[in-house]
């Protein structure tokens, strides 16, 4: 006992409806606290959600978003600043709450509307008209590689964090929270088979709503076989094991754990028992499941992550990928993506110019012609020459733009560019490919950015920029962010994988191989032909054996093997290395050097810790078998 006493003024008590008044009074004589109020908050979170509409209970999050916009003077930020604020501040406000509750679509729509409006227009006070959005929110929430801005969808963030919470309940089943949840909601089952019909809290209802997402992307790697056959996702047909069980047979007892399906004192499937209990089809499936040598409990793995550990970030990516597969995005020209892939990683380009480049290439600028289509009262004519103002006219066809390009250090003649009918991105790509050395990505978009600023000043402030001012501002913007590249930076990134060190085999004899030298090099490689349909990859393994006496490759020994099992490329490389090790053992080699062109695989073998450092969770069975093979020699 610490001897400390609670603060009774800050404490309150909540009784169940079935507690009598006499019992309440008796308890209050011991604990002098007030009754609990439904609107009590703790650390900014409501302790009791009494509203039938959960969005009302969490309406304070919506108010936080609105107040944060006002405090940060959002209207003073350009689009780059708004993007940074959205990604850093706005995304962090609801994180604590999203870990514990699945927000309603209504609440998420209200919050998303704030963020979306803020990105396009900032905060417009006393404006009740719906602002114009030139690109869909789905397009903006795509990754930068896919042509978006990388803003995360709140709905997917919410589900991803709940998936991570559910993962922790299963992965760390000995934690206090996991034990409490199990005792309350599934004392005689697992999270995977927990019933959904029992009375549940908001937290547990949220976990159950995303359970199928977690179940779809986990697997269990078998070591000791201590996993239950009936309520764990250990094989593709685990949910049907009860239906497949042959209750009429009397030769075997009904098994409980996976190890009960192994032969006695071995880690090999008991084919006769499995066939008798569950049928031949079940046996065919189980024979494809690798068994990891060694001791230790079975390992739950999150398949999308190389570490096998689930995180909210990894879960978000999985959900985003699934959503994109169900809702294919609009086709974006290849040239647009190629230009954006040059713009985003270029540290010499200012962030405001980068976001402008995105709006320009994705046709999301508020040009007069685009605004006129939605608001006919706004004229679509150019403020300088009176022609229809779109991107092509504003940046290349207008006489002012032509003069700016020709007077710039690029010395560009717009007449020499391809037809503008093919799209603005074609002209920009042509300048980047065929222009002089001064036509850098940063300079091109800095000039276009200043042309856009000049247009806005003339249209809204009646300020006319000169050609010299446009060029001077563009030069200043382009030079301001030119960061010096440290010498030798690129040389630090090499891709030559080190070979695996010599692998000694103690106790081996060399009598049967006197014609071969001790120093033998075994090159192991795998080839994977990826197919469109999942589970149909074609795998081939090649082994090349070279000794000191081998003068050229044509006289070396070469083995090739086709694998019927479907493997991922990394696991196929590991299988090739394991086959090379088995070949060395079969040849009774004293010393052999195994070589692979896979850096991850080489590092894992040298680390000698397949359980804790497998490199990739799928490598754990192969690496464990490799090390067991070495230890037995």
Model-inferred region functions:
Residues 1-579, 583-596, 600-611, 619-633:
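A helix-boundary/hinge signal
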């Amino acid at each position: 006992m610490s001897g400390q006493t609670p603060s009774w003024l800050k404490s309150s008590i909540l009784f169940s409806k079935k507690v009598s008044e006499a019992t309440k009074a008796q308890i209050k004589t011991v604990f002098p606290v007030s009754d609990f109020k439904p609107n009590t908050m703790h650390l900014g979170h409501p302790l009791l959600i009494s509203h039938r509409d959960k969005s009302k209970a969490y309406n304070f999050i919506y108010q936080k978003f609105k107040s944060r916009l006002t405090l940060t003077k959002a209207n003073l930020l350009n689009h780059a600043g708004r993007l940074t604020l959205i990604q850093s501040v706005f995304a962090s406000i609801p994180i604590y709450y999203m870990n514990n509750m699945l927000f309603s679509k209504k609440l998420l729509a209200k919050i998303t509307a704030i963020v979306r409006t803020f990105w396009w227009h900032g905060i417009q006070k006393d404006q009740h008209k719906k602002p114009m959005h030139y690109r869909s929110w789905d397009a903006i929430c795509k990754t930068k590689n896919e042509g978006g801005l990388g803003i995360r969808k709140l709905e997917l963030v919410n589900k991803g964090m709940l998936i991570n919470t559910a993962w922790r309940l299963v992965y760390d089943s000995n934690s206090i929270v996991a034990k409490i949840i199990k005792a309350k909601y599934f004392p005689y089952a697992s999270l995977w088979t927990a019933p959904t019909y029992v009375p549940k809290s908001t937290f547990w209802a949220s976990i159950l709503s995303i359970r199928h997402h977690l179940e779809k992307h986990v697997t269990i790697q078998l070591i000791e076989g201590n996993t239950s056959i009936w309520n764990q996702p250990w094989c593709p047909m685990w949910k049907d094991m009860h239906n497949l069980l042959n209750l009429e047979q009397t030769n075997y007892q009904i098994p409980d754990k996976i190890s009960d399906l192994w032969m006695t004192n071995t880690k090999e499937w008991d084919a006769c028992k499995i066939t008798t209990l569950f049928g031949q089809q079940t046996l065919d499936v189980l024979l494809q499941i690798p068994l990891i040598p060694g001791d230790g409990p079975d390992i739950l793995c999150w398949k999308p992550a190389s570490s096998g550990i689930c995180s909210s970030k990894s879960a978000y990516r999985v959900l985003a990928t699934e959503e994109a597969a169900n809702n294919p995005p609009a086709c974006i020209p290849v040239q647009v993506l190629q230009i954006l892939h040059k713009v985003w990683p270029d540290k010499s380009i200012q962030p405001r110019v980068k976001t402008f480049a995105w709006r320009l290439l994705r046709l999301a600028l508020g040009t007069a012609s685009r605004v006129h289509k939605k608001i006919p009262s706004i004229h679509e004519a150019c403020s300088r020459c009176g022609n229809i103002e779109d991107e092509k006219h504003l940046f290349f066809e207008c006489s002012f733009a032509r003069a700016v390009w020709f007077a710039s250090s690029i010395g560009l003649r717009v007449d020499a560019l391809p037809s503008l009918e093919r799209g603005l991105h074609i002209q920009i790509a042509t300048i980047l490919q065929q222009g002089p050395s001064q036509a850098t990505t940063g300079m091109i978009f800095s000039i276009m950015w200043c042309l856009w600023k000049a247009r806005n000043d003339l249209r809204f402030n009646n300020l006319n920029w000169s050609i010299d001012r446009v060029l001077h501002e563009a030069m200043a913007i382009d030079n301001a962010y030119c960061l010096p590249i440290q010498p030798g930076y690129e040389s630090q990134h090499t891709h030559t994988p080190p070979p695996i060190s010599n692998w000694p085999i103690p106790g081996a004899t060399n009598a049967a191989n006197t014609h071969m030298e001790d120093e033998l090099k075994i090159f192991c490689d795998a080839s994977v032909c990826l197919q469109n349909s999942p589970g149909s990859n074609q795998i081939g393994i090649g082994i090349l054996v070279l000794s000191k006496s081998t003068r050229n490759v044509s006289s070396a020994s070469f083995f090739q093997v086709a694998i019927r099992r479907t493997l991922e490329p990394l696991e196929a490389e590991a299988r090739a290395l394991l086959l090379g090790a088995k070949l060395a053992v079969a040849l009774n080699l004293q010393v052999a050097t195994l070589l692979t062109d896979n850096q991850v695989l080489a590092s894992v073998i040298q680390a000698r810790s397949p359980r804790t450092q497998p490199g990739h969770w799928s490598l754990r069975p192969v690496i464990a078998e490799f090390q067991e093979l070495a230890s037995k020699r």
